[in-house]
Amino acid sequence: MTRRTALMVGVARLLPAYPAKEFWNDKNPSDWNAEEIDLLLNKSPWAKDASISYYGGQNGPLSNSLPGERSRSSRNASSGTSPSAASPAAWKAIIRWQSALPVRLALKAEPSPDTEKFYILNMVGDVPSVGATPDEDAAQRAARFETLKQVTKLEHKGDEILLSRVEVAPKNNLSLAGTLFYFSRGLALRPEDKQATFSTKLGPIDVKCKFTLRDMMYRGNLEL
């Protein structure tokens, strides 16, 4: 087990299965305590454990580094194995709806015009990075992003919102480093859509996470 996975497992064990009370609707953000912020960022309607399927092979963009870490050669520094050879149980991730207002309030994030234009989802955990590597040239990066666009989507009721942009989210005092996926808000999600599903492929793994939209209400509004 890597240090990153151990940290995530430790957080999961400390957090209840689901908040007993929707404190985000009952308390002002300035009154949220550290435990409540952890809940909102790691186990809440806006932050869910991803379902990860390991199938071997490599269909999809893959960097040997984890988000926020320097590129490795062909070996995983913490386990001594390449990412594609790692045990399926080693892959852990949380998908966090980073553009949602309560998440931004918990992170004390600065206002950004991107949150008005995009649904932004953050994949945090012990999974391969899709960030650029130092030995890539511009053409290789562009080709890898095109591949990523083909395998990454946000779905609801049969409609697909395709990937617009991807970038690394740096580590801070509230969150591990992650990968940000940007999807256009041109196709608006509504509570009656019931569910939205994020999915992508990273080398040997499929990553999927389902969100229940009616649970993602904040002060009477669907916040995504």
Identify the function of each model-found stretch.
Residues 1-11:
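N-terminal secretory signal peptides and thylakoid transit peptides that target proteins
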Residues 11-17:
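Hydrophobic h-region of N-terminal signal peptides that target proteins for export
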Residues 18-224:
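PEST-like low-complexity, intrinsically disordered acidic/proline/serine-rich tracts
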